[in-house]
Amino acid sequence: MRIKLIRCIELKAIVTLSLVLINSGNLLIGSNLFIRDNNDLSADTILRYNHYPTGKLYVYYSKDQTNQSSPAVIFFFGGGWNSGSPKQFESQASYLNKYGVTVVLADYRTQKNAGTTPKEALMDAKSAMRYLKQHAMSIHVDPDKILAGGGSAGGHLAAATAFCHQINNPEDDLNVSSIPKALILFNPVIDNGPHGYGFDRVKDYYRDFSPIHNIKKDAPPAIFFLGSEDNIAVSYTHLRAHE
C-alpha cells in the first residue's frame, strides 16, 4: 500500500487523550448490563445496546483502570455498511488503553449480517452512543468525555452521530444526545451526495444521512487521517468539510 500523504485537520486538546491520566487501582464491576459472548474479540466486558443480534459493545479497559470515571472512545468499523467486524480497531484499543482511555468497539447492522441498509447502520451507531452515555457511570466512563471514531463507512457513522440529527431509531430516548465530545476519523466517508460515496443506496434520504450536508459551526472538534492514494474518501472532500 502506498500512502503519500497523511493530512491532519483541526486537532484540539480534547483529542490528545494521553493528557488524561488515571490513578492506578483495581476495577470492580458487577452489573446485569454485561453479557457473555463467543466472539473472538478479547474484550474485557460486553454490553448489549439494543435487541438485535449485532447490538453489542465490546469494552476494553486500561490495566490501570480504577473505579473513577475515565475518558472513552467508541469506534465503528468500516466496510461500506455492507460487512466488517469490531475487531478492526482492536489495535487502537490496545494503544489507547496504555494512556488510561477506555475503548468501546461497536457492532452494528450491515447488509451482510442483517440484510439492512445504511440507514439502519446509522440508527444503530446513534443508539450505541446514547446507550454508552446513559450507562457511562456503570462502566466507570465519564459521560462528558466520550469521543467517537471510525474508518471509512465507520468514520461516516462516527461523524454522523455528531452531525446528522434526523435519522434515529424510534425506540431511542431522543433526550439523550448522540453527539460525542470529539471525533477521530480515519479516511471517513462524509459526502453521500450526488457526487459522493454510496449515493445510489441513500439517494432518497442523503440530505439527512450525509455529514457534509449537515455540518454546523458548533460541531465538535475532529481530527482526520487521510491518504492521498485513497480514491473513496477523497481528500478534497474533507478539506471542504474543514472550511
Language model features by range: what are they?
Residues 69-78:
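Short beta-strand element of the alpha/beta-hydrolase
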Residues 237-243:
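Conserved small/polar residues in nucleotide/adenosyl-binding loops
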Residues 130-196:
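Primarily recognizes the serine-hydrolase "nucleophile elbow" in alpha/beta-hydrolase
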Residues 180-214, 220:
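Mobile cap/lid helix-loop segments that gate and shape the active-site cleft of serine hydrolases
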Residues 117-136:
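Alpha/beta-hydrolase active-site loop
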Residues 87-104:
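Short amphipathic alpha-helix adjacent to the substrate-entry channel of hydrolases
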Residues 224-226:
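Short beta-strand/loop motif that positions the catalytic acidic residue
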Residues 32-66:
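N-terminal cap/lid segment of alpha/beta-hydrolase-fold proteins
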